[in-house]
Amino acid sequence: MNVKVENIEKNVVKLEITVDSEKFNEAVKKSFKKNAKRFNVPGFRKGKAPLNIIKKYYGEGVLFEDAINFCCEDTYPKAIEENNIKPVDYPQIDVVQIGEGKDFIYTAEVTTVPEVKLGEYKGVEVKKVSYEVEDEAVENELKSMQEKNARVFLKEEGEIEKGNIAIIDFKGYVDGKAFEGGEAKDYEIEIGSGTFIGDFEDQLVGLKKDESKEVNVSFPEEYGREDLNGKPATFEVTIKDIKVKELPALDDEFAKEVSEFDTLEELKSDIKDRMKKELSEKAKAEYEEAVVEAVGANAEIEIPKVMIEKEIENMVRDLEMRLKYQGLDLKSYYEFTNSSEEKVKEYMRETAEKRVKTDLIMQEIAKVEDIKATEEELKEKAMEVAKQYGQKDVEKTAELIANAQKSYLEIDIVNGKVLDLLVENSKEIA
């Protein structure tokens, strides 16, 4: 095998790879073995005609397609390894020379990992991030717990008041016509919750069970549906039932019922401690992100478009998986959000570029600092991931993960070490 390398443009190289005629003939024979059964030649049972007859009957090129694939699969990986080329995508293969008794020559044009010029990455100055737990946040959490433990019962007599729950049938019209998604029966709505648009809920105050009313509202300009944005609408509403929500008193008895604590003060203290922990983790994550951004701002990289496009595709696949768990698909998501594949991808572009840049910087720092993942760390990481699957045989699952996802585990471990290095060497400023 002979290889010539030509730099076509920045981050794009073309390899001209020559496979000697003997090797190519072996690939042709291999192709014949693979395809022999599909050839039907008069005078021979199907699949039994010899190679020389097949060539005469069908032409020598009939076996070239698979022979080319065999040669490329064998020689291309060796060529990029020998020339220290790190591709970021599949190559564009073009045949230069092919034929019986000839050397097989082809070119492989491929985009490569870009050069990363690191700037200052140790000692970057980053503003301190900190959060305090507000008393209001604790009170809001208590109110939320109070709401979850409220007693709800039917209101036998009287009108709808703020805070009541109305059971309604409704049908909406825009421009005199019913619209999709504008109708429901036995719908529960808490008056004053702001669930519905405009003052829809306020217009129900004062109504009694079995009464009906036309409610007039306007959809917000940015409602998210072109057929409804900014348009006035009329809803025919019928009150089916009225419910009253009775909140439990916030006292020691409440604390005993909803927690392991004996007093309300102990419950408040626990809520505050949990919030402190959450805010501390949030501050840590934001500080780490700020450190990485500062390091990124000091680096120079010309990212190939194909890397960004690949990351966008990964993000779309992740979105598709998340939607699947919710019983949705991409088509439904696009319709619901009044979007499209093109709009979503464009929205993801900035984040994708940021992710690719960060990954490249982390890899380059790991290379400069000689940061690697040890076998012990790989085992621990695999075990950590395996436990999340909830399988009985965790050790066996970890072993499977370690083998199948080794490269991903290594990247995760190395990136974590690089992040620790950057944070430890950063300068926190007020």
UniProtKB/Swiss-Prot annotation:
Disulfide bonds: none
SUPFAM superfamilies: FKBP-like (SSF54534), Triger factor/SurA peptide-binding domain-like (SSF109998), Trigger factor ribosome-binding domain (SSF102735)
PROSITE patterns: FKBP_PPIASE (PS50059)
Catalysis: reaction(s): [protein]-peptidylproline (omega=180) = [protein]-peptidylproline (omega=0)
E.C. number: 5.2.1.8
UniProt KW keywords: Cell cycle, Cell division, Chaperone, Cytoplasm, Isomerase, Rotamase
Gene3D superfamilies: 3.10.50.40, Trigger factor ribosome-binding domain, Trigger factor, C-terminal domain
Residues in PPIase FKBP-type domain copies: 163-248
Localization, UniProt: Cytoplasm
GO term, biological process aspect, one: cell division
Any one Gene Ontology cellular component term annotated for this protein: cytoplasm
Single GO MF descriptor: protein folding chaperone
Family, similarity comment: Belongs to the FKBP-type PPIase family. Tig subfamily.
Job description of the protein: Involved in protein export. Acts as a chaperone by maintaining the newly synthesized protein in an open conformation. Functions as a peptidyl-prolyl cis-trans isomerase.
NCBIfam families: tig
UniProt free text on domains: Consists of 3 domains; the N-terminus binds the ribosome, the middle domain has PPIase activity, while the C-terminus has intrinsic chaperone activity on its own.
Protein name (record): Trigger factor
Biological source species: Clostridium botulinum (strain Loch Maree / Type A3)
Lineage: Bacteria, Bacillati, Bacillota, Clostridia, Eubacteriales
